[in-house]
Amino acid sequence: MNFNKKTIEDIQVKGKKVLVRCDFNVPLKDGVITDENRLNGALPTIKYLVENGAKVILCSHMGKPKGEPKPELSLAPVAKRLSELLGKEIKFAPDNTVVGENAKAAVAEMKDGDVVLLENTRYRKEETKNGEEFSKELASLAEIFVNDAFGTAHRAHCSTVGVTDYIDTAVCGYLIQKELKFLGNAVETPEKPFVAILGGAKVSDKIAVINNLLDKVDTIIIGGGMAYTFLKAQGYEIGTSLVEEDRLDYAKEMIAKAEEKGVNFLLPVDHRVAAEFKDVEATVTEDQNIPAGTMGLDIGPKTEKLYADAVKDAKTVIWNGPMGVFEFENFNKGTIAVAKAMADSNATTIIGGGDSAAAVNILGFGDKMTHISTGGGASLEFLEGKVLPGISALND
């Protein structure tokens, strides 16, 4: 996949109508936005376009309205809060059809530097099917398309791919540019030693990632629920821990492949365990084996040190997926230890979206990382080496 895409700085935007696909899929509680990270992430691109005299038309999805208008998934609260953050009024166009009379009228009245926000693109069922009609309607509003929603770049939808069939100038905003720079460089030309830390519950979610990264990394670190499948494959006792029986052969294969390629394949050497899946006091095991009647819920202290040492010597570190059940206070220690090791390291540190990003932000290490990806599924597919349709649709 070509990572050298044209950006908003490569084109003339003054006086032009610019449709910007943002990621405003934010959590709402009683109409109030509870996490503003995605709004703040969109500001640099919007500010640049406003300051350079573009007519800025913003669009995004929120939640899963499944092609029907749902008032609780309206983008009205986003328009209100974004206006405050931008320090400039953003006109909201409340059309259930997204590109309706309100939107057309609002766009027709725009002056240079004005901003309009369209309604939730998933109010239209064609959006997720990349339907021609809705793509044309969106494209009819603008002369330039900017994609700045990395979180949906792995989806071929009307507002990410379809519009580019009808608008010739299609470029990326600052957010996607940053994702391509850090994730792209990490995957294509990483500074070595390159360490990948993979956690989370399931091996099956990370198969393609492990496959792709084994050709690039010096060390792979495995934590979270998926570690128990690898340990069982090597003949260790795992008690009642999570295991994917149908992935045991695959786990053996990966360990053999790592050995063949000279990649360090690190698995937990001790665990924090409990008798049931609850936030109860943890027992630390002596070694890799987990006693009968207990389940592993986090890596243990010896493993924390082993993993932290690997991170300390690295020049590039990518992390995707927690080391344990970090929602439980007794079992968040491994995740904290890895986050801290990355925060203290001099390496380029990249967090691959999703749960790891949430964990790092909750733990207060966010500003110590080089880059926190804004896309969970998108960054995973990127690490799998897949082409992301929302990015390949943009001008080289």
Curated annotation (Swiss-Prot):
Lineage: Bacteria, Bacillati, Bacillota, Clostridia, Eubacteriales
Ligand binding (substrate): D23, F24, N25, R38, H61, M62, G63, K64, R122, R155
Pathway: Carbohydrate degradation; glycolysis; pyruvate from D-glyceraldehyde 3-phosphate: step 2/5
Coiled-coil regions, chain positions: none
Molecular function terms from GO: ADP binding; ATP binding; phosphoglycerate kinase activity
InterPro entries according to UniProt: Phosphoglycerate_kinase (IPR001576), Phosphoglycerate_kinase_CS (IPR015911), Phosphoglycerate_kinase_N (IPR015824), Phosphoglycerate_kinase_sf (IPR036043)
Enzyme Commission number(s) of this protein: 2.7.2.3
Keywords for the protein's UniProt record, in alphabetical order: ATP-binding, Cytoplasm, Glycolysis, Kinase, Nucleotide-binding, Transferase
SUPFAM superfamilies the UniProt entry points to: Phosphoglycerate kinase
Uppermost EC category: transferase
Protein name: Phosphoglycerate kinase
GO biological process: gluconeogenesis; glycolytic process
Compartment(s) of residence: Cytoplasm
Organism: Clostridium botulinum (strain Alaska E43 / Type E3)
